[in-house]
A protein has these predicted regions:
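Short, small-residue-biased leader/transition segments that mark boundaries at the very start
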Residues: 1-6
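Non-catalytic positions within long, well-ordered alpha-helices that form the structural scaffold/packing
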Residues: 16, 20-23
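N-terminal glycine-rich phosphate/adenylate-binding segment common to multiple enzyme folds
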Residues: 25-36
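Short beta-strand segments
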Residues: 30-32, 60-61, 88
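Short Gly/Thr/Asp-enriched flexible loops that form oxyanion-binding sites at enzyme active sites
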Residues: 34-48
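Short, acidic/small-residue loops that bind anionic groups at enzyme active sites
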Residues: 49-66
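Long, charged alpha-helical interface segments
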Residues: 69-144
Length: 144
């Protein structure tokens, strides 16, 4: 590891926090999906640090773009990383969650961390609207 073996944060989190301190407004994490699943999950959770700081950050690899948001958003099909879209709660129950413009829309659903209902949806309309009233969600744009 690049830092002390007894550290309290992963190297990825240390680097991300440094980027925020240095004023970065956008960060792309490469090499963050390979190898150990525990590190992948820690990297996904670490995206919350950037989200809370107002920094656009994502994990990117050949088939996936993963990011975290705490705000409703609109995704454009023309800018999507791939045809598939999965959404997960990152922290507790997400109230009043809605998906519009997808093959399997949802309307005012309370999204639980254990829900698989929002896995592998697809863009149908030119824009997908994701809305919710609390918490953070993980958005995964994927392709085969």
């Amino acid at each position: 590891a690049a830092s002390d073996v007894y550290k309290r944060q992963t190297d990825t989190e240390i680097a991300l926090r440094l980027g925020i301190t240095l004023g970065s407004k956008e960060m792309i994490l490469l090499g963050a999906t390979g190898g150990r699943i525990d590190h992948l999950w820690a990297n996904v959770q670490t995206l919350s640090v950037a989200c809370d700081a107002g920094v656009n950050a994502c994990i990117l690899d050949e088939k996936n773009k993963i990011w975290v948001t705490n705000k409703s958003c609109v995704l454009k099909k023309s800018e999507a990383y791939g045809p598939y879209l999965s959404v997960f709660s990152l922290e507790g129950e997400i109230y009043d969650f809605s998906l519009e413009g997808t093959k399997w829309p949802l309307n005012h659903h309370d999204l639980m961390p254990c829900d698989s209902l929002t896995v592998s949806n697809q863009f149908v309309d030119d824009e997908v609207k994701i809305s919710f009233v609390n918490g953070r969600i993980v958005i995964m744009e994927t392709k085969d």
